[in-house]
Amino acid sequence: FRRSAYKLFDANLLYTPWNKLFSRAYVDERGLRFPQTFWDDFPFVLSVIRDVERVAVTSKQYYHFMRARAESETAAYRSNMYDKREEEHGWMLDLYAHWGVQDEASMEMVARRYVERLVGCVENVTNPRCTLSKEGKRREIAKIIGGEQARKCLKLARPRSAMMKAILLPIKWNNVSLTMLESRVVSKVNSSNTKLFATLKAKR
């Protein structure tokens, strides 16, 4: 499971609690609970799979879920989003270090996951609801795309779509102005056509 986990991450099967059947006994024995934080599902799932050595994958559907909230968390501006993504990346690195798995395919997935979410961090800054000044936005974006992890992961990541390759170019070039311009377009699509945005996001 551990050496193939990158495939399940890429198939979006290891991020959220749904699409899974957990052993209640396993969860209770280890005292695993959802942490008191926003985006609490991801750290919970990581805590469950941390010491798991085998999983079973089935094509059958055993339950359905419904989710409803007043506002999508992906559409809201969050001043600490970048810090949260940095924290998540640390969790992924820690998980793979704990597993003793450092092969090229796994590390590429971890790096690609990180840089794809950097795009979201930049879009968060160009979001119309962002309260930063124009110069404040430039400074924040410069910090995001020029960070140590960003530069390292951009070298390791191999985007799977032409769209994502194109989106990452300004970030690779460390070009703040072009990155901001591109991100404003993304923000516009996100705010005006959420269905199109979700479709494009799914095809990244």
Residue spans of the language-model regions?
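Residues within HEAT/ARM-like alpha-solenoid scaffolds
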Residues: 83, 87, 105-113
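Alpha-helical structural motif
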Residues: 1-4, 88, 114, 137
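Amphipathic alpha-helical repeat scaffolds of TPR domains
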Residues: 109-123
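Inter-helical turn/loop segments and adjacent helix faces that build the functional surface
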Residues: 34, 99-105
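Membrane-interface aromatic/basic loop that binds lipid-linked glycans or pyrophosphate carriers
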Residues: 127-204
